[in-house]
Amino acid sequence: MKKEKAVVVFSGGQDSTTCLFWAIEQFAEVEAVTFNYNQRHKLEIDCAAKIAKELGIKHTVLDMSLLNQLAPNALTRTDMEITHEEGELPSTFVDGRNLLFLSFAAVLAKQVGARHIVTGVCETDFSGYPDCRDVFVKSLNVTLNLSMDYPFVIHTPLMWIDKAETWKLSDELGAFEFVREKTLTCYNGIIGDGCGECPACQLRKAGLDTYLQEREGANN
């Protein structure tokens, strides 16, 4: 894969930034694509742009505001509370988001001569999002190949690892401090360790604490 090109679906968060570093190591050329769907905090787009610029990665931002018109939710509406009731999809789930993002990433990838698409979706820390499942990604990969008669390969480096292992991967890639200090995971738009209270921050912190304990134990 070292001679090939990849497009990374990039939000500027922990997972997609780890995937960006993974792609940089795996491929000869990497581009990043970020989607503006009127998310709760526009800082996410700014954060992604800054990271891409710092890493020297060509970065494209695509307007997906139509998604907010079709599927208003807690990620795009400040007047909706972030909730997750047992047996129901989280209020942060955006219908069709990964379906559309990966489809548009594929269109871009073909235009720039890339076969490979990298995304940070994950089943292990499954948050109730059906479009983060491996079966969905594999199905969409086949559909995209058929729809454009092009041999795409969708890579999901985080699919079977948890948040602690994602921190470990960033460390192995030499990006641990970068990811910890410069990425935006927080639903409230606070870069780095975030607000510490929203579900995204809690999941991120739990994984970080577990990994740091494991790393300290391994060094003793």
UniProtKB/Swiss-Prot annotation:
GO molecular function: ATP binding; ligase activity, forming carbon-nitrogen bonds; zinc ion binding
Keyword ATP-binding: yes
Pathway info: Purine metabolism; 7-cyano-7-deazaguanine biosynthesis
Pfam families, per the entry: QueC
Keywords: ATP-binding, Ligase, Metal-binding, Nucleotide-binding, Queuosine biosynthesis, Zinc
Binding site for Zn(2+): 186, 195, 198, 201
Note describing how the cofactor binds: Binds 1 zinc ion per subunit.
InterPro entries named in the record: QueC, Rossmann-like_a/b/a_fold
Assembly notes: Homodimer.
Function: Catalyzes the ATP-dependent conversion of 7-carboxy-7-deazaguanine (CDG) to 7-cyano-7-deazaguanine (preQ(0)).
Family: Belongs to the QueC family.
Record protein name field: 7-cyano-7-deazaguanine synthase
Natural source organism: Bacillus cereus (strain G9842)
Gene: queC
